[in-house]
Swiss-Prot record:
Membrane topology designation: Single-pass membrane protein
Quaternary structure and partners: PSII is composed of 1 copy each of membrane proteins PsbA, PsbB, PsbC, PsbD, PsbE, PsbF, PsbH, PsbI, PsbJ, PsbK, PsbL, PsbM, PsbT, PsbX, PsbY, PsbZ, Psb30/Ycf12, peripheral proteins PsbO, CyanoQ (PsbQ), PsbU, PsbV and a large number of cofactors. It forms dimeric complexes.
Transmembrane feature ranges: 12-26
Role played: One of the components of the core complex of photosystem II (PSII). PSII is a light-driven water:plastoquinone oxidoreductase that uses light energy to abstract electrons from H(2)O, generating O(2) and a proton gradient subsequently used for ATP formation. It consists of a core antenna complex that captures photons, and an electron transfer chain that converts photonic excitation into a charge separation.
Statement: the UniProt record of this protein carries the keyword Transmembrane helix: yes
Stated name of the protein: Photosystem II reaction center protein J
Gene Ontology biological-process entries: photosynthesis
InterPro entries: PSII_PsbJ, PSII_PsbJ_sf
Keywords: Acetylation, Membrane, Photosynthesis, Photosystem II, Reaction center, Thylakoid, Transmembrane, Transmembrane helix
GO CC annotation terms, alphabetical: photosystem II reaction center; plasma membrane-derived thylakoid membrane
Regions of this protein lying in the Lumenal compartment: 27-40
Residue ranges, Cytoplasmic side: 2-11
Length: 40
């Protein structure tokens, strides 16, 4: 599974992308929830 020719391994790209998506979605929901709570 070490057949990358100087490129970034796909599993690292997938892991970083997945964590980025989780962080963005989490921040989005947290911002929406905090905005909803403060507007009430």
């Amino acid at each position: 599974m070490m057949s990358e020719g100087g490129r970034i391994p796909l599993w690292i790209v997938a892991t970083v992308a997945g964590m980025g998506v989780i962080v963005i979605v989490g921040l989005f929901f947290y911002g929406a929830y905090a905005g909803l709570g403060s507007s009430l």
